[in-house]
Amino acid sequence: KANLIWKQYLSPETLITTQVFDGQSRLVATIPQALRLEIDALRKEDSKYKALDETVLMAILASRQAVAQAGWQSGDVFGINIGSSRGATQLFEKYHKEFIETGKTATLTSPTTTLGNISSWIAHDLKSTGPEISHSITCSTALHAVLNAVAWLQSGMATKFLVGGSEAPLTPFTLAQMQALKIYAKEDQEYQSRAFDLNKTKNSMVLCEAASVACLELGE
């Protein structure tokens, strides 16, 4: 997957597409179909995963790959700090809509939409017994996970830490929020997302879905 990502970085073609959400045309960046199939397979792998939000499922898949590449073993003691800016917004919007329409909520509404369920489910999947931390600090959430893990490692309270972030914000409500803030990219721009263009004269935010995880540990 890393090779595919690097290949896309080198390509002059954008993966940003226009999709319709509740009748509104929005610019978004989605995960590849192959990864979508992996998420669907993960849902079926364990009956408990069926009700989880995509932020959790993507984080689990990314964590499995990171741990395998680092050579960590199932059951190893390591800390986990995976954050999310928007959290389980897909499930939250689904459950809220059901509540508005029926006046009732599903049993799993609370446990599957609380922010802490990302790191705890990763710990469950990897059978880790170390500390589990979740947080939300907007766009710098994943970076703060790295900073927090470094503090744990340097303090001697941990020797290994799994860190990162996961976002699945492509929902009508979340996209509408960004539009309301007037920070979203316009379709008539030549390059819609210009995050590193310090001379741009228009806002150029584009939401995407992704999970990124890294393994940090003390050196010898």
Go through the PLM ranges and name each one:
Residues 1-48, 219-220:
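ACP-dependent fatty acid/polyketide chain-elongation machinery
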Residues 2, 91-95, 172-177:
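Short acidic, glycine/serine/threonine-rich loops at helix termini
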Residues 42-52, 107-108, 132-135, 198-204:
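A short glycine/serine-rich beta->alpha loop
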Residues 49-65, 71-74:
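N-terminal amphipathic, basic-rich helices that act as targeting or association modules
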Residues 59-69, 115-118, 123-126, 131-167, ...:
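Active-site-proximal alpha-helical scaffold in enzymes
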Residues 76-83:
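Short glycine-rich phosphate-binding loop at a beta-alpha junction
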Residues 84-133, 180-181:
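Active-site-proximal gating segment of KS-fold condensing enzymes and close homologs
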Residues 104-106, 147, 151, 168-220:
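Glycine-/small-residue-rich "gating" segment that lines the acyl/pantetheine channel
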